[in-house]
């Protein structure tokens, strides 16, 4: 497996792949000051590869790079200490960290990050390039649009719809639908412009 991006996020993916026994060939990054990461060689070669995982935390940058690279198969990494229902679906390129629970009927899009200790309950639909931060809890039947960021320790009430490119602040409690492009913070979560 090849990783794209020698970031802190890459370190966590390395831990997951090592725990799974998945061989890591090398890491690709354009920063000339990084020659290795956790003992793995970092190269500048953005060539065509058979199988890779995007290891950049920023959803926006992740999407830009994925769209311009020629990778035949985007792998996924699911930590062995994550609990994922056999009746859930996880898209290509998605990374699921330790302590995560993804329940039955949940559909997780492509190139998402479901971070440490987050929970996604039954029948949720999570779009592509979404980041569910550590300790965030998503109740059943929630829909989250592409490119959204659900902040650390936040919680989302059942059957809520969160639009595309939304940022939910750390510790927020989302109890009503959130429109596209909004940043919402607080308990209950409100559009930041309302403060």
Where are each of the predicted segments found?
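Hydrophobic, well-ordered beta-alpha structural blocks that scaffold small-molecule cofactor pockets
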Residues: 1-45, 94
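Generic structural signal for conserved hydrophobic packing positions in ordered secondary structure
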Residues: 5, 52, 74, 121-122
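Small/polar loops that bind or transfer phosphate-bearing groups
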Residues: 5, 53-57, 158
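Short glycine-rich anion-binding loops that position phosphate/pyrophosphate groups of nucleotides
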Residues: 9, 57-60, 190
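Short amphipathic alpha-helical segments
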Residues: 14-16, 64-68, 108, 179-180
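Phosphate-bearing ligand-interacting subdomains
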Residues: 32-85
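Structural signal for interior beta-strand "rungs" in well-ordered beta-sheet cores
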Residues: 77-192
């Amino acid at each position: 497996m090849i990783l794209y991006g020698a970031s802190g996020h890459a370190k966590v993916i390395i831990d997951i792949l090592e725990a799974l026994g998945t061989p890591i060939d090398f890491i690709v990054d354009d920063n000339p000051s990084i020659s290795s990461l956790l003992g793995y060689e970092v190269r500048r070669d953005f060539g065509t590869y058979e199988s890779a995982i995007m290891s950049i935390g920023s959803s926006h940058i992740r999407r830009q790079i994925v769209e311009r690279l020629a990778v035949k198969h985007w792998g996924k990494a699911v930590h062995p200490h994550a609990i994922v229902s056999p009746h859930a679906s996880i898209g290509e390129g998605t990374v699921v960290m330790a302590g995560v629970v993804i329940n039955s009927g949940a559909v997780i899009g492509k190139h998402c990050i479901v971070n440490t200790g987050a929970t996604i309950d039954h029948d949720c639909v999570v779009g592509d390039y979404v980041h569910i931060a550590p300790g965030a809890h998503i109740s059943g039947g929630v829909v989250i649009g592409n490119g959204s960021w659900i902040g650390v320790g936040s919680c989302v009430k059942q059957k809520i719809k969160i639009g595309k490119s939304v940022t939910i602040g750390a510790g927020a409690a989302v109890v009503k639908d959130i429109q596209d492009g909004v940043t919402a913070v607080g308990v209950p979560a409100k559009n930041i412009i309302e403060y």
